[in-house]
From Swiss-Prot:
The lineage of its organism: Eukaryota, Viridiplantae, Streptophyta, Embryophyta, Tracheophyta. The keyword Signal does not apply. This is Large ribosomal subunit protein eL24y. It is found in: Cytoplasm; Nucleus; Nucleus, Nucleolus; Nucleus, Nucleoplasm. One of its GO terms (biological process) is adaxial/abaxial pattern specification. Might have an extraribosomal function in reinitiation of translation of ETTIN and MONOPTEROS genes that are involved in the auxin-mediated gynoecium patterning. Essential in leaf polarity establishment, probably having a role for translation in leaf dorsoventral patterning to specify leaf adaxial identity. GO terms for cellular component: cytosol; cytosolic large ribosomal subunit; nucleolus; nucleoplasm. SUPFAM superfamilies: Glucocorticoid receptor-like (DNA-binding domain) (SSF57716). Belongs to the eukaryotic ribosomal protein eL24 family. The gene is RPL24B. Residues 119-133 have a biased composition (Basic and acidic residues). It comes from Arabidopsis thaliana. GO terms for molecular function: mRNA binding; structural constituent of ribosome. Residues 119-163 are annotated as: Disordered. It holds the Pfam family Ribosomal_L24e.
Length: 163
């Protein structure tokens, strides 16, 4: 028979079936505590990393040396082959790597110049549209008689200003 154990959210100790206190926060997050001591410390916002009897403290201060020795770290080995990047074959990458710095700089500057020209072109187009729109607005304003705008009555009312 296998017992389903859970871990205390504060102390990190095992909680066996029929034990523990379940706390459900207003955001529907469930916390399971081993006993009222863990629950009380959690609600008082004590940090489990500062209490010597909790699992978090023991882990931070390297107290469980026996468990750490069991976990062997596997050394990351570099793979001997070289993979091609999506969109570029291995030959293209080798060719670019062999390229002289002067050629690379010239290509970069040409690309930057092209981008700047494109940005300048879009700015000029926006300016032209803006000028055209402003001239249309002035024509529309010129069509309205000034007397119609001035014939408004005096402003009346308390106005909802600040006190």
């Amino acid at each position: 028979m296998v017992l389903k154990t859970e871990l205390c959210r504060f102390s990190g100790q095992k909680i066996y079936p029929g034990r523990g206190i379940r706390f459900i926060r207003s955001d529907s997050q469930v916390f399971l505590f081993l006993n009222s001591k863990c629950k009380r410390y959690f609600h008082n916002k004590l940090k489990p990393s500062k209490l010597a009897w909790t699992a978090m403290y023991r882990k931070q201060h390297k107290k469980d040396a026996a468990q750490e020795a069991v976990k062997r770290r596997r050394r990351a080995t570099k793979k001997p082959y070289s993979r091609s990047i999506v969109g570029a074959t291995l030959e293209v990458i080798q060719k670019k790597r062999a390229e002289k710095p002067e050629v690379r700089d010239a290509a970069r500057e040409a690309a930057l110049r092209e981008i700047k020209e494109r940005i300048k072109k879009t700015k000029d187009e926006k300016k032209a549209k803006k000028v055209e729109f402003a001239s249309k607005q002035q024509k529309v304003k010129a069509n309205f008689p000034k007397a119609a705008a001035a014939s408004k009555g005096p402003k009346v009312g308390g106005g909802g200003g600040k006190r």
